[in-house]
Amino acid sequence: MINEIKKDTQERMEKSLEALKGHISKIRTGRAQPSLLDAIQVEYYGSATPLRQLANVVAEDARTLAVTVFDRSLISAVEKAILTSDLGLNPSSAGTTIRVPLPPLTEERRRDLIKIVKGEGEQGKVSIRNIRRDANDKIKTLEKEKQISENDERKAQDDIQKITDIYIKKVDEILADKEKELMDF
């Protein structure tokens, strides 16, 4: 029973960590990353369609993304979607490829992005702590129902805390890496 709670806790914390990585990867650094354009929706036959379903996005070099549209008739719609996104990008088309140069980040913008990254990290930590609280509540319930002893309860809570500490440390490492990436480029 306790092992199931620990396993479930670890799986949920891993999902929180993956969600954090996903959120942070969308925050623009000076380096061109195809995931930067993942959130862009293109008007396609009257409905908003994710860009990655209509085009292939690759990093051409450190500061340029190349978007190869599958259907030539969509080039202007894709270009417009990138231009009107809140990413502040200025695409230019050349044949079937749209080049998206990334402007260098200003010092002020880097600091703003670091604040955003720290906020995302704090959300990740809160999520992990909430998962810990849920696990501890389940363990306390088992002890109240006399399914486990007080010693088993304490040991299980210590184990849950160790798992929590590991994941909080992983969040801190992810944040430190992203901050370094933002300041170095």
UniProtKB/Swiss-Prot annotation:
Name by which UniProt lists this protein: Ribosome-recycling factor
Keywords: Cytoplasm, Protein biosynthesis
Localization per Swiss-Prot or TrEMBL: Cytoplasm
InterPro entries: Ribosome_recyc_fac, Ribosome_recyc_fac_dom, RRF_sf
Disulfide cysteine pairs (residue numbers): none
Main location: cytoplasm
Protein source organism: Glaesserella parasuis serovar 5 (strain SH0165) (Haemophilus parasuis)
Molecular function via GO: ribosomal large subunit binding
GO cellular component: cytosol
Homology family: Belongs to the RRF family.
Function: Responsible for the release of ribosomes from messenger RNA at the termination of protein biosynthesis. May increase the efficiency of translation by recycling ribosomes from one round of translation to another.
